[in-house]
Structures are given as C-alpha cells and as structure tokens.
From Swiss-Prot:
Modified residues (N6-(pyridoxal phosphate)lysine): K200
Cofactor note: Binds 1 pyridoxal phosphate per subunit.
Source species taxonomy: Bacteria, Pseudomonadati, Pseudomonadota, Gammaproteobacteria, Vibrionales
UniProt source species: Vibrio vulnificus (strain CMCP6)
Name recorded for this polypeptide: Phosphoserine aminotransferase
Catalytic activity: O-phospho-L-serine + 2-oxoglutarate = 3-phosphooxypyruvate + L-glutamate; 4-(phosphooxy)-L-threonine + 2-oxoglutarate = (R)-3-hydroxy-2-oxo-4-phosphooxybutanoate + L-glutamate
Localisation: Cytoplasm
UniProt xrefs under Pfam families: Aminotran_5
Length: 364
C-alpha cells in the first residue's frame, strides 16, 4: 500500500528532501521541457536552452548569497570529497602546509585526503563546555604561519555541531559548507573558497558548487587533473566536460524556490524556528538527550539519544509507520538524527515532536 506523500516527512541527512514544488515542477516538465518535446536531461549541454539554464542558475545563486564579482561560481562533479583533493591541489602553490581545523568527522576526512598532497597542520578545535560537546572559539584557533590556507567545516552533520565564527587571518579561509550553505546568511567576501556538495540544500547528488576568489585561480599544481582545476573550470564555464545537466537544472529550480521564499534571510528565520522547536522539546524532556552545547548546536542536523537506547529500533519503526523517515543516527554515534534542511517544513518538525512526546509518554 502506497503512503500518502502529504503525510511523509524525510529527515535524511543526504541525499536529503527537496522542496515539493521543485519536485512537482520537474515532474510536470520531465517529458516535454519548454515545449521542446524532450526532457531537459536529453538536450545538449551546449545548446542555447541549457546554457540559459546554467547562466540563470549561477545568477540566482549569486543573488541569494550576494556573491561579489571577484568570485567565480563553479558547478563541479565528484561531490565534496572531490573538493577535499581539489582544494590543496589548487591552492597550495609552493607551500607545503595548510591549517585544518578539526571539529568532527568531515573535517578529519578532508585532512586525510590533504595528506596525499601536503603536510596538513591540524588544530583540534573540539572542546567540552558544561559537560557538552563544543568547539573552541575561532579566536583561539592556532594557524600555521606558513599555511597556504585555513580549512574548516562549519557544520558537522554527524555530531550536529555548528561553527558560527571565523578566525581573523590574512590566510584564505576555505569552508566545506555542504550541509549549511543557503541555510543562513554569510559574508562570502570573508572566504577564499566555499564549496558544497549539492545533496543537502542545493539539489540532488551528483553536483557540487565551488565559489572561488579570483586571485586564487592559477595556483594549481601541474599534476592536478583538469577536471578539478578551478582555472580550467572557470574558463570553460563549468563545462570542461559534459556536466550533470539534470542535477544542474534541479539545483536551479531550488534556487528559484528559495528566492520565492524570501531568500536566505527569510529561510534562516524559518530554520531557527524549526531548530528551536526541536531543541526546546529535547531540553525539556528527561527522556531524550542532545549532547551538544547550545553555542554550537547545528541548525540543520539534530542528533538525539534516548535514556533507554534499547528502544531505538522501536522508535524508528513507529516513526517510519507515521511517515517520519530516515531518523536513524549515523553509525558512528548511533541514536537518532533529524536533518531539517531548508526543504523541511515547520509542520514536519512539529509532527516529529508530537510523535516524540507520545513515544515518551508510552515508554518512559
């Protein structure tokens, strides 16, 4: 028996839920896009019709993030993991080290990849505050004087940790914003490179965004594959080879949807409201636990455990039956995790809290 999609809320950490209006538009246009009699995924990436999609997508993203003119916007392949390699290979130049701020799993993953190309200087920013997980303030981060750049991940999806400040440094700041881009306002001009896998707040998996300051182009090592070379991608308008056109088109629809919601400033207010509803209930409960200090709690990913972990399987089964999908926590930390990206409506978070309350009453 098929489930009524009106009552389904997808809390997947990624690939994550897409806005329903975007999915509906893609469905309507799937077989006959713009009256061409074909799908958008069947036309040449060099056709005037698709180039218009690409150009509009870039402009909409520039508008949403207020990206300065001296930054290139690149639509890349390989996801954020490809950027783990692309960043050092593009930015090191003659340097032999870069500072990596370690606040969690994804920052550590970037370090492991960087070790193939340099000797990363790792500053562990993990901390404990009032018995909870936290991150040291950026003012306390130690940056190597010879670092080519400073890399960090502002939002760690597994632990549900978010970093809200930046160091004061003359080094280019590189941020893996895969799980936080477009969720809150940022000042792009403070960064050298911002990159993000698409499958959280941008679109479907298969594409990534890199926003690169112009002065950082042209530093690439000779061994860098052309497909990862920021300068090559910029010169070729992100079409050095055939791009993932359908993912690009869908990302463009997401950008238009976000503009229609009032842009990043408006969606940030919604995101803060959603997160507050969930965190407030967890904090008021004696049955559920979140182990992150309020100063560093993620707006996008809310992990929680129960005081009776033996009930995890029952919780997940009953939640699934009610249309509350993909709440299982990452295998590294266990428990549950609610990912509440831009596409998650407030109604979904309220439905989750209602279920959590009922489950607590029945099982406490």
């Amino acid at each position: 028996m098929e489930q009524n999609t009106d009552n389904v809320f997808n809390f997947s950490a990624g690939p994550a839920a897409l806005p329903k209006p975007v999915m509906q538009q893609a469905q309507q246009e799937l077989l006959n896009w713009q009256g061409l009699g074909t799908s958008v995924m069947e036309i040449s990436h060099r056709s005037k019709e698709f180039i218009a999609v690409a150009e509009q997508s870039e402009q909409d993203l520039r508008d949403l993030l207020n990206i300065p003119d001296n930054y290139k916007v690149l639509f890349c392949q390989g996801g954020a993991r490809a950027q783990f390699a692309a960043v050092p290979l593009n930015l090191l130049g003659d340097a032999t080290t870069a500072t990596y701020i370690d606040a969690g799993y994804w920052a550590e993953s970037a370090v492991e990849e960087a070790k193939k190309y340099c000797q990363p200087d790792v500053f562990v920013a993990k901390a404990e505050k009032e018995g909870k997980q936290a991150v040291l303030p950026a003012s306390e981060w130690q940056i190597h004087p010879d670092a080519a750049y400073v890399h960090f991940c502002p939002n760690e999806t597994i632990d549900g940790i978010e970093i809200n400040d930046l160091p004061v440094t003359d080094k280019p700041i590189v941020a893996d914003m895969s799980s936080t881009i477009l969720s809150r306002e940022i000042d792009v001009s403070k960064y050298g490179v911002i990159y993000a896998g698409a499958q959280k707040n941008i679109g479907p998996s298969g594409i990534a965004i890199a926003i690169v300051r112009d002065d950082l182009l042209g530093l690439a090592k000779e061994v860098l594959p052309s497909i990862l070379n920021y300068k090559v991608l910029a010169e070729q308008d992100s079409m050095f080879n055939t791009p993932p056109t359908f993912a690009w088109y869908l990302s463009g629809l997401v950008f238009k949807w976000l503009k229609a919601q009032g842009g990043v400033k408006a969606i940030e207010q919604v995101n803060r409201e959603k997160a507050a509803i969930l965190y407030n209930y967890i904090d008021e409960s004696d049955f559920y636990i979140n182990n992150v200090h309020p100063d560093n709690r993620s707006l996008m990913n809310v992990p929680f455990q129960m005081v009776k972990p033996e009930l995890d399987a029952k919780f997940l089964k009953e939640a699934e039956a009610l249309g509350l999908k993909s709440l299982k926590g990452h295998r590294v930390v266990g428990g549950m995790r609610a990912s509440i990206y831009n596409a998650m409506p407030i109604e979904g978070v309220k439905a989750l809290v209602d279920f959590m309350r009922q489950f607590e009453q029945e099982n406490a």
